């Protein structure tokens, strides 16, 4: 399924540089994602020293945002959307950071410094120098010094020849300038620093004084792994110190919710460079969660008539040439393996295999819909800068399915898929999501299957269902799969950019490429339509999201260890014997239970159980043994509850069987 792992991200994304110098300021502001924490942004510290007049974007004076206005040009920035003001501030702060870096590293050369969801960044080539953690403080100190100077930020229009001369020793800027048209090139001056940029910017560096550089990493130039690795430094800027402080607190909270930290603390998965970057390995406890997710979704699908299959992780190059993926997706695939005169590739998706399963036998209209599902292992060569734990890797497992339907069944089957998505979200308590109808860009004939009638029909079909179901959604041009439009359900993880959890894609293209058919009621051969869908998306990514949403405080049915039993005195045979009896009673009901009878202090064992996010911590003392009770504490709670052993076992069995969310999210 093409949408899986396909959303645009800031790290390593090549789309940013292509349009960076060509877009108008209003489009730049539109495209840059706002920070999620500034919804209530009310600051008026940004001062717009311009003529008060209605802002009219239709007059093609986009250069007037914060520029020395020309005759008859004026802007009313007071009415401009507040988050757009914040983006402008962050973009200006990127220039402030670049100026500071240039002061400290005179050899520095800069690529681009856009605004992204988490603030801003700038890619820089420092030659032999490498930015380390201790250097960040030095850069911040220089930035504060420059901001305090109160230098004005001024826009200048220059000719292409002037720009080439101005940046003649900077191959990165020359590369940008080469794509620009003469008469449409601007630079910004602030004191002794000049940068090539379309803007917009605030008019004084002192407005950028409330900033923080938050991290640094490597990034390929233009997002291409064949190019040099530049140093990328991220930062964030706010109009007031109070807003900055609040945001930094949110960042600290986000770090605690990062699934990579939780996975390490709970011993769930690991990544090792010797195995390969982007190739996570699930440890025993992590694999328990993975299996529970697999069983959960397969059981739901079986009740809806899905037929589960297993297909190989490789296929011939010819298979992907037939499907069209070789032409449209080759750059995201691992290179071919040549063996005995055949070329094989690790599969990046499962559609071609499922097409061949359908083609294995003849079908009548009476057979349709046919719903083929699989928990499938897929491989995609993601750039190293985009890799992120189990949320985004080079190997992942998709909860994939392909529904083969007649044209008359499209809307009904699409409705059932949408219902399945939202019933699943209800089970997991997922409420904060955004629905996106991804459409083709009609002007891009190379990216998409060229059939206007097919596209119009497919897009209208999905719109109809979404409107009938009264689902709020936005449309995004140019984000469809190459073979058809799709519905993506996106969520915001604790760290990083928005991700896609679920997707449903409508496809008139692949069935024809594979010559699939069914016999209709008139005895004529017809081509089926295919719905590609993934409810959990990839199990890896879904697991990462749930870990972050719950801070690892999983519902009991999903927890790798559901109960930990701890005798107060580990050297007392009677207490240890009763603790083992409790474990036996729970194991008989398929409860995942651990006996912790190590010769450690009880407080130490309790704290370890809390770090491991075990839902039920049971303490066995002499009172519990005599009364045949259990004394337990739910994770995230301080109160202790005492129940008879049989009653506790029954309670826990019911909670797990019915997948109750008794304590999920208690640490939120």
Q: What positions do the PLM features span?
A:
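Cationic, low-complexity basic patches in intrinsically disordered or flexible, solvent-exposed regions
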Residues: 3-8, 27
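Aromatic (phenylalanine/tyrosine) cluster motif
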Residues: 20, 41, 65-69
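Intrinsically disordered, low-complexity segments enriched in serine/proline and basic residues
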Residues: 13-14, 32-33, 52-62
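Cysteine-centered motifs
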Residues: 28, 35-37, 64
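NTP/phosphate- and nucleic-acid-binding module
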Residues: 20, 70-111, 115-119, 123-668
């Amino acid at each position: 399924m093409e949408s899986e792992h396909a959303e645009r991200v800031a790290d390593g994304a090549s789309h940013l540089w292509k349009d960076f110098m060509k877009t108008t300021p209003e489009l730049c502001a539109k495209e840059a994602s706002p920070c999620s924490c500034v919804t209530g942004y009310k600051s008026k510290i940004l001062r717009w020293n311009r003529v008060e007049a209605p802002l009219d974007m239709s007059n093609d004076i986009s250069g007037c945002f914060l520029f020395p206005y020309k005759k008859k040009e004026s802007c009313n920035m007071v009415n401009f959307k507040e988050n757009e003001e914040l983006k402008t501030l962050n973009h200006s702060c990127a220039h402030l950071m670049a100026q500071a870096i240039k002061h400290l590293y005179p050899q520095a050369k800069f690529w681009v410094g856009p605004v992204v969801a988490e603030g801003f960044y700038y890619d820089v080539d420092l030659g032999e120098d490498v930015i380390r953690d201790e250097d960040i403080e030095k850069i911040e100190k220089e930035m504060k010094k420059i901001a305090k100077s109160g230098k004005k930020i001024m826009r200048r229009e220059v000719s292409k020849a002037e720009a080439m001369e101005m940046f003649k020793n900077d191959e990165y800027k020359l590369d940008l300038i080469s794509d620009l048209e003469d008469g449409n090139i601007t630079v910004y001056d602030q004191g002794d620093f000049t940068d090539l940029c379309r803007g917009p910017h605030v008019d004084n560096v002192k407005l950028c004084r409330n900033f923080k550089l938050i991290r640094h990493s490597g990034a390929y130039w233009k997002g291409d792994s064949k190019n040099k690795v530049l140093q990328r430094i991220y930062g964030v800027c706010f109009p007031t110190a109070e807003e900055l402080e609040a945001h930094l607190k949110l960042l600290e909270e986000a770090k605690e919710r990062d699934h990579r930290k939780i996975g390490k603390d709970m011993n769930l998965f690991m990544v090792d460079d010797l195995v390969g970057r982007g190739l996570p390995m699930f440890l025993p406890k992590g694999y328990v969660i993975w299996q529970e997710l697999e069983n959960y979704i397969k059981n739901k699908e079986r009740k809806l008539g899905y037929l589960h299959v297993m297909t190989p992780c490789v296929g011939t190059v010819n298979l992907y040439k037939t499907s069209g993926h070789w032409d449209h997706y080759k750059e995201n695939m691992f290179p071919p393996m040549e063996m005995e005169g055949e070329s094989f590739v690790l599969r990046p998706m499962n559609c071609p295999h499922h097409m061949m399963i359908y083609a294995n036998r003849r079908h009548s209209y009476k057979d349709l819909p046919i719903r083929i599902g699989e928990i499938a292992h897929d491989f995609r060569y993601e750039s190293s800068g985009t890799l992120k734990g189990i949320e985004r890797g080079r190997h992942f497992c998709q909860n994939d399915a392909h529904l083969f339907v007649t044209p008359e069944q499209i809307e009904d089957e699409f409705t059932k898929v949408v219902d399945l998505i939202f019933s699943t979200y209800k089970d997991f308590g997922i409420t904060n999501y955004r629905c996106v109808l991804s459409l083709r860009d009609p002007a891009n004939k190379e990216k998409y299957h060229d059939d206007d009638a097919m596209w119009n029909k497919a897009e209208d079909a999905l719109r109809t269902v979404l409107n009938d179901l009264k689902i709020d959604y936005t449309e995004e041009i140019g984000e469809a799969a190459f073979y058809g439009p799709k519905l993506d359900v996106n969520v915001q993880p604790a760290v990083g950019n928005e991700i896609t959890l679920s997707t449903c894609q409508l496809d008139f293209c692949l069935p024809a490429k594979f010559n699939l058919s069914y016999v209709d009621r008139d005895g004529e051969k017809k081509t089926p339509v295919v719905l590609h869908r993934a409810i959990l998306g990839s199990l890896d990514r879904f697991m990462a999201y749930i870990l972050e949403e719950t801070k690892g405080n999983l519902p009991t049915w999903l927890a790798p260890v559901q109960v930990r039993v701890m005798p107060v005195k580990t050297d007392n045979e009677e207490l240890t014997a009763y603790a083992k009896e409790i474990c036996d009673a729970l194991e008989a009901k398929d409860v995942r239970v651990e006996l912790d009878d190590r010769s450690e202090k009880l407080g130490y064992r309790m704290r370890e159980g809390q770090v491991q996010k075990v839902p039920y911590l049971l303490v066995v003392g002499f009172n519990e043994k005599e009364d045949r009770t259990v004394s337990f504490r739910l994770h995230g709670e301080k109160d202790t509850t005492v129940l008879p052993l049989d009653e506790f076992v029954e309670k826990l069995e019911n909670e797990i069987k019915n997948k109750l969310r008794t304590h999920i999210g208690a640490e939120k």
